A protein has these predicted regions:
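Metal-cofactor-binding active-site regions of metalloenzymes
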Residues: 2-291, 343-345, 349-354, 358-361, ...
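Hard-cation-handling environments
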Residues: 306
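Short, basic/hydrophobic alpha-helical segments
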Residues: 334-340
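Short glycine/proline- and charge-enriched loop/turn segments
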Residues: 310-318
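A short acidic, glycine-rich active-site loop
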Residues: 269-270, 319-325
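C-terminal amphipathic alpha-helical interaction region
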Residues: 295-297
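Divalent-cation-assisted or electrostatically stabilized phosphate/pyrophosphate-binding catalytic cores
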Residues: 325-331
């Protein structure tokens, strides 16, 4: 019987073990999409407790705790102690068997704190105290943890109105061995014209850009100024969170009318919203192409399903789910339009619904050319960021594209303890290849396979994003 969470965790055979230990494990991490708070990196934040580090902002854990019957005040409440929240999480962990949270939890305890005990109500106090004692050490600061995990570069997620002062100060003052921190452009608030806060956001954009915005053309000018500012401060990557792709036809005059209606607070039709979003994403894609950035599209989520909890807690608190959208034709038209204009830059497509894996994997091949893996199928995202989901994504990419050109894993996380997800991904990758060798489906060529593993773990991302 194999042991849980030992050095050969998830590695079924000698080939997989060799590929992981001698090729994958040594490669640095380029975490090209995350939700870390830049201020915490810039100030080298010191964590007061394992609860702050582990449970603060982690909607994966909150969701599991709610499902286990834990009262909301132990998830997001302000009137409960760090120990009380941790205790409720420890009570939940034994019920997460076969959920990725069980693997992540114990990988994180082992790789960060050297703790190999299983977290449960019996061990909760001991583990809580041991983690908190270690968090007092300088090597457990935000940057200390990043260096511990061999993180070379992180890309945060930043709004066009952000002043990037944390990125600027960090770049100016960081030590030679500190990881790079690069901003990424996320203009969702400028796209979501149907939101009641859209007008207030446009005013914010006016303030930071110095452009008076009364028309859509003005907003494009303001966004271009901010885009240039981001580029001047190292940004080479954009990201868009969309439900689906849009293909509704529009004219410039229609977009101006729609924009002016929104600024006046008038109700927009569904068609008008979709026309605007199609136009907006096209303009952003053209801007990215001109700047030689990579663009990312995360699509397929139904967000904020629980209105009561959204009103209480706001977005990104664990009330989102997988959507079902018939968007293949719209995606094709969008990419084709950009390609015809010579404005299709490097692109990564992420789907939240794994039913669309083959849709994306085949879509990539329609628009490749000019550089290896120009159009990418993004790693298993969010609910697919687990063993089965990552295997499904890589299997689809393998049979319908070139797995060898894949840019690999990202954390998409708000936590400084999420870097073992890169290790988890690499173990799964090596195990897939090792099992294929064992079955005679791949040759036992360790040089060929080792190079492939190193490329997917690190080299492909380094070449693709052109961060440095």
């Amino acid at each position: 019987m194999k042991q849980f969470n030992d050095k050969n965790f998830v590695l079924d055979n000698e080939v997989a073990q060799d590929l992981f230990h001698n090729h994958a494990a040594k490669m640095p991490i380029i975490d090209y999409h995350c939700h870390l708070i830049p201020e915490m990196v810039a100030n080298d934040h010191k964590f007061k407790s394992i609860t702050e580090l582990w449970l603060g902002g982690d909607h994966y854990k909150w969701r599991a705790m709610r499902t286990n019957g834990v009262d909301e005040r132990y998830c997001t409440g302000k009137d409960t102690s760090d120990w009380e929240k941790f205790e409720k999480w420890a009570e939940t962990v034994p019920y997460t068997l076969r959920n990725p949270l069980y693997h992540w939890t114990h990988l994180e305890l082992k790789t960060a704190f050297g703790i190999e005990k299983l977290l449960s109500p019996k061990t909760a106090r001991e583990i809580f105290d041991e983690c908190n004692e270690k968090l007092k050490r300088p090597e457990f600061s935000a940057r200390g943890l990043m260096k511990h995990y061999n993180v070379e570069c992180v890309c945060t997620t930043d709004d066009p109105v952000d002043d990037l002062h944390n990125h600027i100060e960090y770049a100016r003052n960081k030590a030679a061995d500190d990881p790079m921190m690069i901003p990424a452009w996320r203009p969702d608030k400028a796209m979501n014209i149907e939101k009641p806060e859209f007008g207030a956001y446009v005013h914010q954009l006016e303030q930071v850009s110095g452009v008076t915005i009364t028309r859509f053309a003005d907003m494009v000018d303001a966004l271009k100024k901010r885009h240039d500012f981001f580029a001047a401060n190292g940004c080479k990557l954009s990201d868009h969170g969309i439900e689906e792709f849009y293909d509704e036809e529009y004219t410039d005059s229609q977009i101006e009318t729609i924009f002016e209606k929104a600024l006046r607070g008038q109700q927009l039709s569904n068609l008008e919203i979709r026309q605007y979003k199609n136009c907006f994403l096209t303009v952003m894609a053209e801007m990215d192409a001109d700047a030689d950035w990579t663009q990312q599209f995360h699509y397929g989520a139904i967000r904020d399903n629980n209105t009561k909890m959204y009103n209480q807690l706001g977005p990104d608190t664990g009330f989102d789910s997988i959507g079902e959208f018939n968007t293949a034709k719209a995606m094709s038209k969008f990419l084709n339009k950009l390609n015809m204009e010579g404005k299709l830059t490097r692109t990564i497509l992420y789907t939240l619904n794994p039913c669309a894996n083959e849709v994306i994997a085949t879509m990539l091949g329609n628009f490749q050319g000019g550089e290896p893996g120009k159009i990418q199928f993004g790693s298993g995202w969010w609910f697919n960021d687990q063993k089965d989901g990552m295997e499904r994504q890589m299997n689809a990419l393998s049979v319908l594209g070139l797995l060898s050109r894949f840019v690999g894993m990202l954390t998409d996380s708000r936590s400084f303890l999420s870097y073992p997800r890169h290790e988890y991904f690499r173990r799964i990758l090596c195990n897939m290849l090792g099992n294929d060798v064992e079955k005679g489906l791949l040759p036992d060529d360790r040089e060929l396979l080792g190079r492939m593993v190193e490329d997917i773990s690190y080299n492909n991302a380094r070449r693709y994003f052109k961060f440095y």
